[in-house]
Amino acid sequence: MKRMSKFARRCAALMLAVVLLCMAAPAAFAAEGDTLPAGATTMGGANTTLIPNEEENCLSWLFGSGDTITMPYLNVKGQGLRRNVTLDLEDCLVGITYTELGSIGSYVSDAAAQQAWKAQAVAIHSYLEYHKKYGSSANALVYTPVDQIPSSARSAIRRAVSEVKDEVLTCNGSVIDAVWSASAGYNTQTGVYGTCSGLDAWGTDVPYLQSVESPYEEQYHNLMRRIIGKDYRYIEYNDSKTGQPYESADTTHKDLGGFVQYNTFVSNGKSYRYIGQFVSSRYCFDFSADENGTPCMNYYGFGHGVGMSQCGMVGYAQEQGMGYRDILRHYYTGVSFGTVGSGSSNGGLFGWLWSLLGLQ
């Protein structure tokens, strides 16, 4: 009797699958031949076709997403901000990791580069999954199509990414918003090189975004400048030739992102205002005079300074031989490691039916 019941259940599930496929397939495969659907674009690399939202949802519902990731919005190098980008997960992480860190294997040991790339890839994956979950945009990231990456760098980065592509960072069971910046710089609040907390930078206390030391900022900011093409220490001069250093400064005028919009300072009893955004968050700069006594502002770091520092990450991997998990645990307080997307293609309606049929 049990065998008959199991057989009947499998037959019913199979019939349901056939009916649903007949109903849904025409909408999913309306394009003829090899012609891409209207609005679709091939962006380079494996399985990187941008397909309309409706068809993407239909295909995912039927077959599951497999080793792909779909972002509502993502910047693609050379193409700008694109909507509903579906990429092979590994390609996606390789492309964004290359954009973020470049060929650091040319400047540090291969072992250090592998750990740094792994840490970056896990942070990227966590960031993408967080913004997918909460329906927000990941347009701060730029994906470099894998066929545009030099072959030596591509193979080295892919070797690192392939080992961690399913890993994400979690806090209390939920994937985290794993933000990072190029260089944390000198934190004048704590008096050490280190990151800013989410509370310091944005006014929001996030348990895993706390201020931590990052001792290799000074040592590696020149390295990161060569890699990414930006200098992480800037000196701005005012129009005063008084020879006096700043006596005081008001840096409380910030935008919603926590960046100082303008700075009012006092030099030799006269008030000046520097208008324009700083290149780093509050607490990541100080005030002094240059060798000629001209007042100047020293900026340390590049970016918001919250979460993982790329300079610090490379430094920990190179100088201490730290592994990617220890690096991530250092910069993201109290996190755990989880997995998202196991590489299985068993998702979607048919995945459920195959399970019901006992074929998995």
Model-derived segments and spans:
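Conserved, single-site charged/polar hotspot
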Residues: 2-360
